[in-house]
């Protein structure tokens, strides 16, 4: 991918400085073994010795695999499930399918439980799991068995910002030096889009559309609203409006009763993140949504699942979407 760094090494001291602010995932620590081909990093499970230059990485969460390609460190095998994009039917997510095929990445079987046998068959020298979703739960439950196969790093599920997730993955594979150029690409595009749009006036409520009939809104500090706020799109504080509602353990969705939707989502604008649920057009036929101010006025937009929990590529694509949705008419 153009502009991606392929530089290999960063000193352990610089690595610690770069990643020291990443909450919950730790940063690389000089374990004195790098000359012997290993290094020690800090994880939620404690200090962990990992390869200094891993060659056969297996990724257990499709939501984390995209970072590996962004870091120019394609895994030998990966789970391919990404919420709202791919599921048990298999197939690589479109965002990195071409890179996965070019690298010869194998697909791990998807199921209700993690296939330890398939992971072992890939002969990994490093395993990366965790993150969010069912695959994160599976990896956590199987951690001890996975650790018998190869050093296993679980990205904390509390890391919902794509920047923090990418830092955690980069730390694990010793590619922290590849992160700053990617972040600069993002900042450059952010400034480009910000200068070319007119954000909607007033607050914007973010609605998550998942499979099933339950009603969800997205907290203002989750990944998608946080990205929008960088562009001047002000999110509604839905948590404050529904203090008794159930916040997901990952912190990026809030389940509310349909009766509360009119109160919680009472904003002049709305953005619907379609993560495998009803489309915007279908929601418009639902009286609970149709009565919202944003739906009545037409100030409602739809973004795909890749924007709900974006990785690096998803964040870049979402910036483009915001640029299209809110393009300045005088520019």
Walk through the language-model features, giving the residues of each.
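C-terminal motif of bacterial Sec signal peptides marking the signal peptidase cleavage site
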Residues: 19-24
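Structured C-terminal subdomain patch of bacterial secreted/periplasmic proteins
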Residues: 171, 264-331
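Bacterial signal peptide processing site
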Residues: 25-29
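Extracytoplasmic substrate-binding proteins
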Residues: 47, 143-213, 316-331
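Basic- and aromatic-lined ligand-binding clefts that recognize polyanionic substrates
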Residues: 56-68, 178-243
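Proline-aspartate-enriched helix->loop->beta-strand connector
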Residues: 116, 123-129, 261, 266-267
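Bacterial N-terminal signal peptides that target proteins for export
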Residues: 1-14
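A short, structured surface patch at a secondary-structure boundary
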Residues: 65-115, 126, 131-132
